Amino acid sequence: MPLPDFHVSEPFTLGIELEMQVVNPPSYDLSQDSSMLIDAVKNKITVGEVKHDITESMLELATDVCRDINQAAGQFSAMQKVVLQAAADHHLEICGGGTHPFQKWQRQEVCDNERYQRTLENFGYLIQQATVFGQHVHVGCASGDDAIYLLHGLSRFVPHFIALSAASPYMQGTDTRFASSRPNIFSAFPDNGPMPWVSNWQQFEALFRCLSYTTMIDSIKDLHWDIRPSPHFGTVEVRVMDTPLTLSHAVNMAGLIQATAHWLLTERPFKHQEKDYLLYKFNRFQACRYGLEGVITDPHTGDRRPLTEDTLRLLEKIAPSAHKMGASSAIEALHRQVVSGLNEAQLMRDFVADGGSLIGLVKKHCEIWAGD
């Protein structure tokens, strides 16, 4: 399929996707019933969309195009109410978190969907292992060239986005010692990590043509980059965050990305170059492994900076943009989080350290989601 032309969209508008866990009490293991839930809610959703993801234990909530995070929060709240009622009617529960702490990937059923079945054929067991749960944020752009500039700008802050949203310390019944273990699942995919370097939309079109020669890439949706342009929506899509435990934190993360995008495209503070990515995976690893306690390294100077310090600096820089976008409350909440030094991964570990079980942890996550 040829790459579509870049659809011009209103700059800085938002679209947010949350991949949710469908769990089966009292075991609180993952259920395989997302199709049943989707059928139950399809005529009751008035804003946004509830749809499949890769496996039958995943449920995706997606907003419509939103002006600001307040509108997005309203749409998510409406969807959440309908989904929680349908889940209760079918004796299921819903929660966030980047991984389910003890599910076995071998039990996961890939959705009966042509695209997902083709992906299963291409990638085999890796697709079942990709039963992990992330938040994706789309930001509108006026042109393809703006999208490429924005993608490179946002890529500088991938460690910050990962550390602030880290919520996947447990996997397959084990403490991984990572704050965010979810991104590691995609390391075996040939398109893992950052997009290959291009400097403008014309070069991106050439890149996509080259990738399509592999026959594994039919559309943008087949690419698993950390951040990717979405020409059919006219957006840049940030894909590195774990699904938060609460709607409020998900909305705050979207506000952070919207405000950062506004600052980047308005101020144009960087002259991007390929060398910017030289230490990308090292810095990304620091955020995944250590969360806010990670240390990032500047590829141009060799300077090393605590991620906490650099995140506070980013929040300060984008504060005027956040005000213009109606996202000041999000930046203030994230500032408090950074100062406290806590992320959701640490709260999960604290629960287990205090004697809680992994089953109890999932139960608690369901209560948190329903109560937010």
Swiss-Prot record:
- Keyword Coiled coil assigned to the entry: answer is no
Known EC number: 6.3.2.2
The alphabetical list of record keywords is: ATP-binding, Ligase, Nucleotide-binding
* Biological process terms in GO annotation: modified amino acid biosynthetic process
Enzyme class, top EC level, equals ligase
- Catalysed reaction, written as an equation: L-cysteine + L-glutamate + ATP = gamma-L-glutamyl-L-cysteine + ADP + phosphate + H(+)
This protein's record includes keyword Zinc = no
GO MF, any single term: ATP binding
Family the UniProt entry places it in: Belongs to the glutamate--cysteine ligase type 2 family. YbdK subfamily.
Quaternary context:
Homodimer.
Q: What does this protein do?
A: ATP-dependent carboxylate-amine ligase which exhibits weak glutamate--cysteine ligase activity.
Protein name as catalogued: Putative glutamate--cysteine ligase 2
Name the gene that codes for it: ybdK
